[in-house]
């Protein structure tokens, strides 16, 4: 086998590996963040209390719904 062919195949395999690894890692992170959102109701309640607001369940539900909707919109835009 010619040396230049071996070099081309190695570079091609490296590029394909990097691209494949990127997309696999991206999919893994998207699934992970969907299952384990970075903020939950308890964190939201604590943040509202720190800001001096009285956290009612209705407000927390509204904020969680709004955050989930924004996350879904961003997912649609990225696809």
Swiss-Prot record:
It is found in: Membrane. Its main location: membrane. It is a single-pass membrane protein. Disulfide bonds: none annotated. One of its GO terms (cellular component) is plasma membrane. The keyword Transferase does not apply. SUPFAM superfamilies: EF-hand. The chain crosses the membrane at residues 4-24. Belongs to the UPF0154 family. This is UPF0154 protein SSP1415. It comes from Staphylococcus saprophyticus subsp. saprophyticus (strain ATCC 15305 / DSM 20229 / NCIMB 8711 / NCTC 7292 / S-41). The lineage of its organism: Bacteria, Bacillati, Bacillota, Bacilli, Bacillales.
